[in-house]
Swiss-Prot record:
It catalyses: DNA(n) + a 2'-deoxyribonucleoside 5'-triphosphate = DNA(n+1) + diphosphate. It is found in: Cytoplasm. Belongs to the DNA polymerase type-C family. DnaE subfamily. NCBIfam families: polc, PRK05673.1. Keywords: Cytoplasm, DNA replication, DNA-directed DNA polymerase, Nucleotidyltransferase, Transferase. Gene3D superfamilies: 1.10.150.870, Bacterial DNA polymerase III alpha subunit, thumb domain, Metal-dependent hydrolases. This is DNA polymerase III subunit alpha. It comes from Mycobacterium tuberculosis (strain ATCC 25618 / H37Rv). DNA polymerase III is a complex, multichain enzyme responsible for most of the replicative synthesis in bacteria. Pol III also exhibits 3' to 5' exonuclease activity. The alpha chain is the DNA polymerase.
Length: 1184
């Protein structure tokens, strides 16, 4: 660049985008727009210590016609990057001028001159993270940079650079040596003297020294502005962002902030006014660098980077794929595959090989084969891959696509240009093992998990803004604002700009919050600052499932990041950016339901001695379809919600295809067109099946028969196009995609071809129009049948387990919800409904997790508060080695020191885990502290190996006479207190419930069950009357000084949060106390994913004069009192819930023993119940 243009232009090279997280406030798109407005030909990006934004910056700048100059403001270790000590160069009095981060790093500005230099920056930033991490800083050193210096331009950097730091410390010789070192590393043409002027003393103090070094070493000057935001008026947004980073408020005089408002993209005239006279050539150097920087296009050129699967000698990947598919078909069909299977497989292989994907299929098959060999449960298939017979033969999927009508072309076809996408579900507890296996197999430098970026979203921006302006009181204002926002749609709030933009589609919905902004100055201030924060990147995270794999070291293609907290290697770019350059992305998904299935199968093996193979269970199991028809699907994969259970009851599924259909239909699109109810009604002959057009009745009969004349699946659209318009299935897939995109010009072109094809087959214009008009809206929501079938199989398996092995399945389900006490309460209530008793934890019987014991479930010790998995493991090992505990003294004598602490012991006592030893809980509580103290000394001696000096049994079992005994008092807490402590430790009432004895009376006075509200059966704003016991009462004061309270209201079936706002609290506050049994009239409040109640009033019922109902007596000879018979009886009783107590009369000759059954088995004595009991136990079972 020369002439007048050079003398008037400028290029900003030192810029921090939002990828300098919580420090840079410059979004890339606005930054490029400002560069274009300023008429600058190029712009640089130098984020702090990372290259996360390189891909977005390159693509956006290139699209805008602006040359991108990609760099990084690197952190340089003051010594070796491997040395994690903090090193200071000056004396203690110079601390403020010394190495940044209290001795952690200096800065160095680095830019890529070409593609080679950019790849070297990828390597440098990656190794800085791998090897130089100190606190939050990824640090390089001179040795590392020297190894990867080719194609890199560096500068002395900002005032925190090494040279400037030495100058501030008065170490002029060391400053000169540092400059000479860096100049030698990159060469004299690639080292520049970086000069900044933001009016800061720290800059002026070293300027003369810098210029002197520049003259001595012939280093050209380079003018930069340390840009952290785009325009001067965005300085306030940047101040706010720094407060978000540091947790400070704007009013804090000691907060970290930038001095002045000059850290923006200044015009060329502004920059030249600063520098042209003082340091001639400093601005021109920016243009020189911009001119020298060559295209980076090669870095972003897509190329095949898929790992090449190793195959035996004599094979290539294609021939080995054929071999493996053939072997797989023989394995799947020992008597030989059915007609047409080999032809279908051969066709699929031809397509796979023609697209260059045989290695991909072999890689996926290898991953799944390893998982199965390691006992890691794998899903039967998800997404369109379930339509591939090759995938089925290789064991990638477990669904035969042909009998289910699944299409390979929906997954892969000759017309498709993109990579196939096979997502894999694994047991979620063991997903990490699969990532490690992939890294071990293909190279730890070639496999990485994938980065994600968390942005400051609408509500978070408002809350952050409120806090930094007003501190803690600001949260109340933010709460008012967020509650006034329109409801989120698909978990997305209206953007803040849309609130005041009349052109935004949701503008009218935002009238309430707009009113607050217009009338309340505090709200307006918060809103304006929040707009500047919204959308900025807050942090980097890891994608839940994506994994990137490459045939070459990943740092040859992208930057990497080592996550400090666990050492995981993560890509520096998100997965679309990685895929765009040809890297292989796979999704390793952790599916909780596979974990539940695995636990349930383990429970069945332990409890019944049966090894279940779910892949072999029949798909026509009667008990499973009866369970589905009853809607008893709480905890069943995909079929759990209240409306879904209602749909199942309407549908009455009778085959696996119904399970697939219900998963496809239960979504907003089909439900909006009432397709889910139409399917149920047509299946059960409540609605006639009408053809789309008389001419189409016969041609489409076979395609639409399984869905009763409705178009439910995308595959049906493809088959229809094939049948009536003579499309190939590959072309039909293109039609399907076009219909889903709804672009008018594309649809018109597709209709033309579709119409021509139908006309050629003799269909009338009326039939063509009728079909097109039917397909078009259905195409928008028709579901991928392959995916529905894959997930339908998991749904069927979980339903099968619940129907046939209820205790084992529910134990797995309870284990899976962990600390989610709300979910656990719902599932415990379902256990009661199923006739399953949930037993308290027990030091002699419990394992770590919930476990099935006969027809009941035993609480796991790991579910007890303050009792960790390591402690439980130690306790179980002791029990296994030394036998069960006979009493509390024996327990303390036997357990390892790691389990012998007061907190653990107290928690186990309160949870009832020692009940089976015959001690009262209160008695144990009174003595446990002194008891633990008494044995700790001995156990510490044992741990040091000293106790053996005094002898143990000759056999080495260590069961000498107890060294400690204690007398436990018989004192016991009253039931109410005992249950309260139990709930404190377990989150739930287990051994009993405060409502036992009155729950039936309470139920008679309410109109809505709590689970119905939580399941979404009750609409927002509905008025309900509920009852239960109050827990976790939390009294608060609002910003106006008015008291209010929140509490958990629990009955025997679940719990829900209730808000008692000031107008209600003022009348009923005295009755809002823990453990109070109450009736509440309330309004349902649904906000985002949260459901709560807003109380209108409260009543404390009086049950003192309640009429006692006569128990229902059921007689059973003791010879019939078998496990199966009692289990069946409990299930019958659970199907007829009510308020009547049940007495079981056990008859043995002339002796009759009467047992009062659990409160959870109260019934309604209806004719239906009497009939069920007589059918199960015989006609004489109801005699008195």
């Amino acid at each position: 660049m020369s002439g007048s243009s050079a003398g008037s232009s400028f290029v900003h090279l030192h810029n921090h985008t939002e990828y300098s997280m919580l420090d840079g406030a410059a979004k890339i798109t606005p930054m490029l727009a400002e560069v274009e407005r300023l008429g600058m030909p190029a712009v640089g990006m130098t984020d702090h210590g990372n290259m996360f934004g390189a891909s977005e910056f390159y693509n956006s700048a290139t699209k805008a016609g602006i040359k991108p100059i990609i760099g990084v403001e690197a952190y340089i270790a003051p010594g070796s990057r491997f040395d994690t000590r903090r090193i200071l160069w000056g004396d203690p009095s110079q601390k403020a001028d010394d190495v940044s981060g209290s001795g952690s790093y200096t800065h160095l500005t680095m830019m890529a001159e070409n593609a080679t230099g950019l790849r070297n920056l990828f390597k440098l930033s990656s190794h800085a993270s791998f090897e130089g991490q100190l606190s939050k800083w990824s640090r390089m050193d001179a040795e590392l940079i020297a190894e990867h210096a080719e194609g890199i331009i560096i500068t002395t950097g900002c005032p925190s650079g090494e040279v400037q730091t030495r100058l501030r410390l008065g170490q002029d010789r060391e400053a000169l040596e540092a400059a000479a070192k860096w100049r030698e590393i990159v060469g004299p043409d690639n080292y520049f003297l970086e000069l900044m002027d933001h009016g800061l003393t720290i800059e002026r103090r070293v300027r003369d020294g810098l210029l002197e070094i520049g003259r001595a070493l012939n280093i050209p000057p380079l003018a930069t502005n340390d840009c952290h935001y785009v325009t001067r008026d965005a300085a306030h947004n940047h101040e706010a962002l720094l407060c978000v980073q540091t947790g400070k408020t704007l009013s804090d005089p000691n907060r970290f902030k930038f001095d002045g408002d000059g850290y923006y993209l200044k015009s060329a005239a502004e920059m030249r006014q600063i520098w042209d006279d003082e340091v001639p050539g400093a601005c021109d150097s920016t243009l020189l660098i911009a001119e020298r920087v060559q295209s980076y296009a090669d870095v972003w050129t897509p190329r095949d980077r898929m790992p090449v699967f190793p195959v035996p000698d004599g094979h290539d990947q294609a021939s080995w794929l054929r071999h493996e598919v053939d072997a797989g078909l023989r394995r799947r069909f020992p008597a030989g595959p059915p007609d047409g299977y080999r032809e279908r497989a051969a066709y699929e292989i031809d397509v796979i090989c023609s697209k260059g994907f045989p290695s991909y299929f072999l890689i996926v098959a290898d991953l799944i084969s390893y998982a199965r060999s390691a006992g890691i449960r794998v899903g039967p298939g998800r997404g369109s891959a379930a339509g591939s017979l090759v995938a089925y033969a290789l064991g990638i999927t477990d669904i035969d696509p042909i009998p289910h009508g699944l299409l390979f072309e929906r997954f892969l076809n000759p017309e498709r240009t993109s990579m196939p996408d096979i997502d894999i579900d694994f047991d979620d507890r063991r997903r990490g093992e699969m990532v490690r296996y992939a890294a071990d197999k293909w190279g730890h430098d070639r496999v990485a998990q994938v980065i994600t970026f968390g942005t400051i979203k609408t509500k978070a921006a408002l809350k952050d803004s409120a806090r930094i302006h007003y501190g803690q009181p600001g949260f109340a204002i933010a709460d008012r604002i967020t509650k006034a926002l329109p409801p989120a749609i698909m978990a997305k709030d209206i953007p803040l700009s849309g609130i005041t933009d009349p052109s935004h589609e949701r503008y009218k919905e935002a009238a309430e919050v707009r009113g607050l902004i217009e009338t309340d100055p505090d709200v307006r201030t918060i809103y304006q600052t929040a707009r500047g924060l919204e959308g900025l990147i807050r942090n980097a995270g890891v994608h839940a499932c994506a994994v990137i794999m490459s045939s070459e070291p990943l740092t040859e293609a992208i930057p990497l990041w080592k996550r400090p907290q666990d050492g995981a290697i993560i890509t520096g770019w998100d997965y679309p950016a990685c895929e765009a350059i040809g890297l292989l992305k796979m999704d390793f998904l952790g599916l909780r339901n596979l974990t539940i299935i695995g636990d349930a199968i383990d429970n069945v093996r332990a409890n019944r001695g049966i090894d279940l193979d779910l892949e072999s269970v029949p798909l026509d199991d009667k008990a499973t379809y009866e369970l589905l028809g009853r809607g008893d699907t709480l905890g069943v994969f995909q079929l759990d919600g209240g409306p879904m259970r209602d749909l199942l009851r309407r549908m009455q599924p009778t085959g696996f295809e119904d399970v697939v259909a219900v998963i496809a239909l239960y979504r907003p699109g089909p439900m909006g067109m009432n397709a889910h109810n139409d399917y149920a009604d047509r299946k059960n002959n409540r609605q006639a099946i009408k053809p789309i057009h008389p001419e189409l009745e016969e041609p489409l009969r076979e395609i639409l028969a399984e869905t009763y004349g409705l178009i439910v699946y995308q595959e049906q659209i493809m088959r229809i196009a094939q049948k009536v318009a003579s499309y190939s299935l590959a072309r039909a897939d293109i039609l399907r995609k076009a219909m889903g995109k709804k672009k008018r010009e594309v649809l018109e072109k597709e209709f033309e071809g579709f119409s021509d094809g139908m006309q050629a087959n003799g269909f009338s214009p009326a039939a063509i129009k009728a079909l097109w008009d039917t397909i078009l809206p259905f195409a928008d929501y028709a579901f991928n049948k392959s995916h529905a079938a894959g997930y339908g199989m998991v749904s069927y398996w979980t339903a099968y387990l619940k129907a046939n092995y209820p205790a084992e399945y529910m134990a797995g389900l309870l284990t899976s919800v962990g600390d989610d006490k709300d979910k656990a309460a719902v599932y415990l209530a379902d256990c009661r409904k199923l006739g399953i008793t949930v037993l308290p934890p027990d030091v002699n019987e419990s394992g770590l997790n919930f476990a099935s014991v006969g027809q009941d479930i035993r609480y796991g010790l790991g579910a007890v508060r303050n009792v960790g998995a390591n402690v439980v493991g130690s306790l179980l090992q002791t029990r296994n080695d030394k036998g069960k505990f006979t009493d509390f003294s024996d327990y303390l004598n036997k357990i390892d020191i790691s389990a012998c602490n007061k907190k653990v012991t107290e928690s186990l006592i309160k949870a009832g885990a020692f009940d089976s030893l015959g001690h009262a809980r209160k008695g144990l509580f009174l003595v446990h502290s002194d008891a633990v103290d008494s044995v700790l000394g001995t156990k510490k001696a044992e741990a040091l190996g000293q106790f053996d000096l005094f002898g143990s049994n000759d056999d080495g079992t260590g069961t000498a006479d107890p060294v400690f005994t204690i007398k436990v008092p018989d004192d016991e807490w009253e039931d109410k207190h005992k249950l309260a402590l139990e709930r404190e430790m377990l989150g739930l009432y287990v051994s009993g419930h405060p409502l036992n004895g009155v729950a039936h009376l309470l139920a008679a006075q309410v109109d809505t069950a709590i689970p119905a509200i939580l399941d979404g059966d009750v609409p927002n704003d509905a008025q309900v009357r509920v009852g239960g016991i109050l827990a976790s009462v939390n009294r608060r004061v609002n910003k106006n000084g008015m008291p209010w309270a929140s509490a958990q209201l629990e009955d025997l079936t679940g719990g829900i949060e209730v808000m008692f706002f000031p107008h209600t609290y003022s009348s009923y506050g005295a009755d809002i106390v823990d453990d109070a049994v109450v009736l509440v009239n309330a309004k349902v409040a649904v906000r985002d994913d949260r459901i709560a109640l807003i109380a209108n009033d409260l009543t404390v019922p009086d049950f003192s004069n309640a009429e006692v109902e006569r128990p229902l007596a059921v007689s059973l000879p003791t010879r019939q009192c078998t496990f199966d018979k009692v289990s069946a009886l409990k299930q019958v009783l659970a199907r007829h819930p009510g308020t009547s107590q049940v007495h079981l009369r056990l008859i043995s000759g002339d002796r009759i023993t009467t047992l009062a059954l659990d409160q959870s088995l109260r019934v309604t004595p209806s004719p239906a119940l009497m009939g069920d009991l007589k059918e199960l136990l015989g006609p004489g079972c109801l005699g008195s």
